[in-house]
């Protein structure tokens, strides 16, 4: 596989707490140029990125970075991100629940978020 073909599988990502709009613009321009799968950006930039780069798949994270937010908070983040133009959601799994063996609760959280995103992409990270 050529590197150009590989790009279509890459989520070009900038998730630092200090990421600026200028950095998001650069990221989006690179993703467009290289035809990457998506850009994964902080939710605070989703609406603006979607307005400036409507041709891109915009991904954002919920429950980031620790995953230990409650399910309702993750659902609220998801709803807002979708309303702002996100086409993909990366959900941070609650590793504490996994370590505790709370698999039914983890499964239910994933199910609820998938229900919320519908036919859009949900990735559990």
PLM feature spans:
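Active-site mouth loops of central-metabolism enzymes
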Residues: 6-21, 59-75, 96-102, 125
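Structural preference for beta-strand elements that scaffold enzyme active sites
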Residues: 7-9, 38, 57-59, 88-92, ...
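Conserved, mostly hydrophobic/aromatic
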Residues: 11, 49, 81, 124
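Conserved alpha/beta-domain cores
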Residues: 16-20, 25-62, 69
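Aromatic/hydrophobic pocket-lining residues that form the small-molecule binding cavity
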Residues: 24, 74, 78, 106, ...
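Structural motif
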Residues: 34, 84, 116-117
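Alpha-helix-loop-beta-strand connector modules within alpha/beta enzyme cores
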Residues: 43-66, 101-123
């Amino acid at each position: 596989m050529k590197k150009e073909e590989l790009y279509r599988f890459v989520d070009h990502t900038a998730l630092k707490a200090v990421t600026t709009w200028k950095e998001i613009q650069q990221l989006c321009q690179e993703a467009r140029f290289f035809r990457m799968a998506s850009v994964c950006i902080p939710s605070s930039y989703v609406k603006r990125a979607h307005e400036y780069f409507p041709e891109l798949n915009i991904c954002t994270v919920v429950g980031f970075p620790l995953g230990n937010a409650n399910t309702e908070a993750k659902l609220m983040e998801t709803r807002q991100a979708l309303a702002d133009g996100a086409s993909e959601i990366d959900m941070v799994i609650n590793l504490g629940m996994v370590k505790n063996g709370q698999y039914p609760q983890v499964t239910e959280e994933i199910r609820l978020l998938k229900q919320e995103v519908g036919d859009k992409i949900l990735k559990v990270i």
